Regions:
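His/Met- and acidic-residue-enriched segments that coordinate or traffic transition-metal cofactors
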Residues: 2-11, 16-180
Length: 180
């Protein structure tokens, strides 16, 4: 049953992101030439890509090291949703001549490394706190891009991802340690 739900969630996330990409590409208007992409859009692509990579790595840790079902299920959801988001973002960034980060930031790597050494209830509490902070940061980043991004497709992508990120944040608050 859980595998069926996970597969359905992964499929839905992939279809949604692919659909958003198709809609943005079909009606998003003219793209900016890669040499004219503002620094803010470049930073968004880089930061969003790194954040997605971090969420996938953290989600995998939650699945393997989490004690509670809530943490493990949330981890599975993070892997599915953030993998799909990175695919969609890469599909938008490529034609703009922008490359996604290939790994999490140094700070994100340090957080991942600290969680690798934890297990059980301690892992769950720490992971819950990290999930809340990371999704608060992601909501701010995507809100900024949705409101002020120069590239129309990146703006659309950010706006369409915001409800999912806000849902993740709400879910993270219900995890052990997520109430901070």
């Amino acid at each position: 049953m859980k595998k069926s739900i996970l597969l359905a969630t992964c499929f839905l996330a992939a279809v949604t992101c692919t659909s958003l990409y198709a809609q943005a590409s079909a009606g998003g208007g003219p793209h900016l030439a890669s040499d004219t992409i503002p620094q803010a859009d470049r930073m968004f692509v880089s930061q969003a890509g790194a954040a997605n990579m971090a969420e996938v790595a953290l989600g995998n840790l939650a699945v393997s090291q989490g004690q509670s079902d809530a943490v493990r299920n949330f981890g599975n959801r993070m892997v599915a949703d953030h993998t799909a988001a990175n695919v969609a973002l890469n599909n938008l960034a490529g034609p703009l001549g922008l490359a996604l980060a290939q790994q999490p930031t140094l700070q994100q790597e340090q957080t991942i490394d600290s969680l690798k050494n934890m297990s059980g209830a301690s892992f769950d509490r720490h992971y819950g706190r990290v999930a809340v902070k990371d999704h608060e940061d992601a909501v701010r980043l995507f809100t900024q891009e949705a409101s002020f991004g120069a590239d129309p497709d990146l703006r659309t992508f950010a706006a369409h991802m915001l409800p999912t990120l806000k849902q993740h944040l709400s879910m993270a608050h219900s995890l052990p340690g997520g109430g901070l």
